Design a protein with these regions (language model features):
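Short acidic N-proximal helix/loop "leader" segments that mark the beginning
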Residues: 1-10
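Short, solvent-exposed secondary-structure boundary/capping segments
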Residues: 72-79
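Short, surface-exposed coil-to-beta transition loops
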Residues: 12, 59-63, 92-96
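A short, structured loop/turn motif at beta-sheet edges
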Residues: 21-22, 66-71, 100-109
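Short beta-edge strand/loop motif at the mouth of beta-sheet-based domains
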Residues: 32-64, 73, 152-163, 171-180
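A conserved amphipathic terminal alpha-helix motif
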Residues: 120-171
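Hydrophobic pocket/interface hotspot
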Residues: 24, 28, 34, 51, ...
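Beta-strand/loop substructures that line and gate deep hydrophobic ligand-binding cavities in soluble
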Residues: 81-131
Length: 180
């Protein structure tokens, strides 16, 4: 089956984080840093290097670093066709670009763009619609990691529970208790 990859998908985010460009680079462009705020990561930290994110039991994403310009710009591609159980020629790679811009006052803005091309199938739109809000908690993690634990090894802990109260109030209470 021949497909035309002419439907563009693109998400853009911007987050201000504490730290120098070098500290932010260590967090976003090294296996140790990404493992601390995003997902357990294996990475050859160079252009052309391989990349693997562990997303859970028996689930991961493989990719390649396509641009490496410390401490300013990182680009990597992932095979989102494989993630979705599709044929590789059905989709372009999922490309993520991180740009670090120093700001006054000891902060940086991190601009993140995720993009790719597909065929316009309904499941593709659903994938991209779900991807957008999925990034947001990770940006909170990045901000907290750089504010309280820059350069330290860390791992994520996911705890789930049902609570009948207001989610915002509960989250605020939890953050205050953890001094975050």
């Amino acid at each position: 089956m021949s497909t035309t990859l002419n439907v563009p998908y693109r998400l853009e985010f911007s987050v201000e984080v504490p730290g120098t460009p070098e500290q932010v680079w260590q967090a976003i462009a090294t296996a140790k840093g990404m493992s601390a705020w995003f997902a357990p990561t294996e990475m050859e930290e160079r252009e052309g290097g391989s990349l693997h994110f562990t997303m859970g039991p028996e689930m991961g994403s493989d990719g390649q670093v396509t641009a490496w310009d410390p401490p300013r710009r990182l680009v990597y591609e992932e095979d989102w066709a494989a993630l979705m159980g599709k044929e590789p020629d059905e989709l372009s790679p999922l490309t993520s670009e991180f740009i670090v811009e120093a700001q006054s006052g000891g902060t940086c803005v991190v601009r993140v763009t995720s993009s790719g091309f597909g065929t316009g199938a309904a499941w593709e739109s659903e994938f991209w619609d779900d991807l957008a809000p999925g990034w947001l908690p990770f940006f909170d993690n990045l901000r907290l990691y750089l504010a309280h634990f820059p350069g330290q090894e860390a791992t994520q802990l996911e705890v789930t529970a049902s609570h009948p109260g207001d989610a915002e109030a509960l989250w605020s209470t939890l953050r205050d208790a953890l001094v975050l």
